[in-house]
C-alpha cells in the first residue's frame, strides 16, 4: 500500500494541523492513495530533554483526532535518541519509504526533521527526487494575521483564554480524569462538586479561575451537562498549596465518586479570589451559576 503522508508531533491537532491534513486527504483522493499522518507516541521535545513542555493532548486523544480528520493510517513512532541522530535523507529512505511506504510527502510550512533539523524544504525535495518520494509544501493556516500553532494555543490556555484556544483548536479544549474524594465544603454550601484527579504532566491545565464547562460523565458518554469548574487553591477554605480541579454540574444529582469525567472548557468567568466569608463565597457562586445559565454558547 502506498501513501500520501505528513509527519509531525501534531500536539493539539489544531486548525493549522487540520488544514495540512485536509491537503493530505485531498491529494490522496486525487492520486488514488491512502492518507497517513505520522506522529510520535512521546513528543520529540520531551525525549530530547525539554521536560517543561506540557502537551495539549494525550497520545490517545491525538490518535482519535487524527482519525476524525480523515487519516487512514496513523503510525505512532517511538522517537529515540538514535532516531534523532538520523539524517533527513536516511529518515526519508529507511523510515518513510521502506518502512511506511510513503509515495508523496506533504511538509508543513515550517516543519523540519532530521539530525539537528538543519535541512529545509529544498533539501527534502532533492532527497525525495533521489528516493522516488514526491515532496509537496503544505500551506499555512493564518488566523488574525498569525499562524495557528501549538505554542500560540498553549499561551492562551496558560492565560485562561480558553474560548480563544478552543477557536484555534477547532474544538473545545478538554481535561479528563477520575472523581476522587474531597473536603465536601461545596456540598455544605449547596454547591456539591466533583474533585477531578488528572494525571500529572499529561495535559496542560488552564490558569487558575472559574470556568463555564460542558461535562461528560464516564468520559465518553453521549450526553453533555452544563457545569462550572474551579481550578486553583481554594483560598477561602484554606486548601493550602495544593492545586485542585472541582466541577459543579448544574441540575444534576447523583454519586460521581470513582467515575471518569471529561470537561470541555467554554469560557472563563473570573479569576480565583479570596472571600471574607463563606456567605460571600456562596453569593458569588450563585452569581457564577446565573451567568453560566445565561451563556448563549451553552
Protein language model features and the residues they cover:
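Glycine-rich, Lys/Arg-enriched anion-binding loops that position phosphate/diphosphate groups
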Residues: 128-230
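N-terminal catalytic cores of NTP/NDP-binding nucleotidyl/phosphoryl-transfer enzymes
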Residues: 1-59
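Residue-level signal for inorganic ion chemistry
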Residues: 14, 66, 105, 165, ...
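N-terminal Rossmann-like or analogous alpha/beta NTP/dinucleotide-binding catalytic cores
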Residues: 46-131
Amino acid at each position: 500500500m502506498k501513501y500520501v503522508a505528513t509527519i509531525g508531533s501534531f500536539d493539539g491537532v489544531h486548525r493549522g494541523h487540520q488544514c495540512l491534513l485536509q491537503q493530505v486527504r485531498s491529494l490522496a483522493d486525487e492520486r488514488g492513495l491512502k492518507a497517513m499522518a505520522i506522529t510520535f507516541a512521546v513528543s520529540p521535545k520531551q525525549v530530547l530533554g525539554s521536560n517543561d513542555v506540557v502537551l495539549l493532548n494525550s497520545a490517545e486523544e491525538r490518535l482519535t483526532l487524527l482519525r476524525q480528520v480523515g487519516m487512514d493510517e496513523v503510525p505512532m513512532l517511538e522517537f529515540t535518541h538514535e532516531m534523532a541522530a538520523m539524517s533527513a535523507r536516511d529518515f526519508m529512505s529507511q523510515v518513510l519509504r521502506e518502512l511506511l511506504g510513503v509515495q508523496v510527502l506533504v511538509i508543513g510550512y515550517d516543519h523540519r526533521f532530521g539530525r539537528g533539523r538543519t535541512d529545509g524544504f529544498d533539501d527534502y525535495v532533492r532527497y525525495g527526487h533521489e528516493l522516488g518520494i514526491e515532496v509537496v509544501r503544505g500551506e499555512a493556516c493564518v488566523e488574525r494575521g498569525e499562524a495557528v500553532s501549538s505554542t500560540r494555543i498553549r499561551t492562551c490556555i496558560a492565560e485562561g483564554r480558553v474560548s480563544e484556544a478552543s477557536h484555534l483548536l477547532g474544538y473545545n479544549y478538554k481535561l479528563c480524569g477520575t472523581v476522587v474524594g474531597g473536603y465536601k465544603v461545596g456540598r455544605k454550601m449547596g454547591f456539591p462538586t466533583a474533585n477531578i484527579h488528572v494525571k500529572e504532566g499529561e495535559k496542560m491545565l488552564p490558569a487558575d479561575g472559574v470556568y463555564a464547562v460542558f461535562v461528560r460523565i464516564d468520559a465518553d458518554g453521549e450526553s453533555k451537562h452544563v457545569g462550572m469548574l474551579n481550578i486553583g487553591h481554594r483560598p477561602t477554605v484554606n486548601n493550602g498549596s495544593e492545586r485542585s480541579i472541582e466541577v459543579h454540574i448544574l441540575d444534576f444529582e447523583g454519586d460521581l465518586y470513582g467515575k471518569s469525567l471529561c470537561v470541555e472548557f467554554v469560557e472563563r468567568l473570573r479569576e480565583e479570589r479570596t472571600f471574607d466569608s463563606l456567605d460571600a463565597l456562596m453569593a458569588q457562586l450563585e452569581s457564577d451559576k446565573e451567568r453560566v445559565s445565561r451563556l448563549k454558547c451553552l
